[in-house]
Regions:
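Multi-pass alpha-helical transmembrane bundles in non-GPCR membrane proteins
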Residues: 2-195
Length: 195
């Protein structure tokens, strides 16, 4: 009897910890969504001041994708104990592909431009579309392949090394590189097995 009681206590404590973690996740991702909305407004205002329609469109795509990314994650963590969990978990993972492609959009169409920018833009959005379809249909299967695909998409910018270097300069390119390294480390940590 004592063993059953200990198991029930352990399960109750584990459930409470999971609930607290999911509440914290929902709150932090909700704050991220609010900050992304503020960032979207700032990006649009700055783009409008440049008078460039391409900047307005590309900055809006990036900002809107970031809002959707955090919103999907907030909804997933908020509804984790409901039947809607699976749908929002798939959307949460799909939004990773969307935000990667949207992150490339200003670089491709404002910084690189021309045929190289449009080509990389097409490749990245095709990869994002394929990733979203794959993740939506085969969500539970081969999760490590999704992480590998995320990282490959993230490093596709090496195809446009010189145009990016010339457009961004050493400081801008260094920041892009630092972001890529940080993202890759995050993907590696995410892909590590948990207990």
């Amino acid at each position: 009897m004592k063993g059953v009681f200990n198991l029930q206590m352990k399960n109750s404590t584990s459930h409470r910890q999971t609930l607290l973690i999911e509440i914290a996740n929902a709150i932090t991702h909700g704050v991220g969504a609010a900050l992304a909305i503020a960032g979207l407004v700032i990006l649009i205002v700055r783009a409008v001041h440049t008078g460039s329609p391409m900047r307005i469109v590309t900055f809006s795509i990036y900002g809107a994708a970031l809002v959707l990314f955090f919103l999907a994650s907030t909804l997933f963590h908020s509804l984790i104990f409901t039947r809607a969990r699976r749908v929002f978990q798939i959307l949460d993972h799909d939004m990773i592909y969307l935000v990667i492609a949207a992150s490339y959009t200003p670089y491709c169409l404002v910084a690189i431009k021309g045929w190289q920018g449009w080509t990389l833009f097409g490749i990245i959005w095709a990869m994002a579309t394929a990733g979203i379809i794959y993740k939506s249909i085969w969500f539970q299967k081969k999760g490590k392949w999704s992480t590998i695909f995320y990282v490959i998409m993230g490093w596709m910018c090496v195809l446009a090394f010189w145009p990016l270097w010339h457009a961004l300069g050493p400081v801008g390119f260094g920041m892009l590189l630092a972001g890529g390294i940080t993202y890759t480390l995050g993907a590696l940590l995410y892909s590590m097995p948990t207990r």
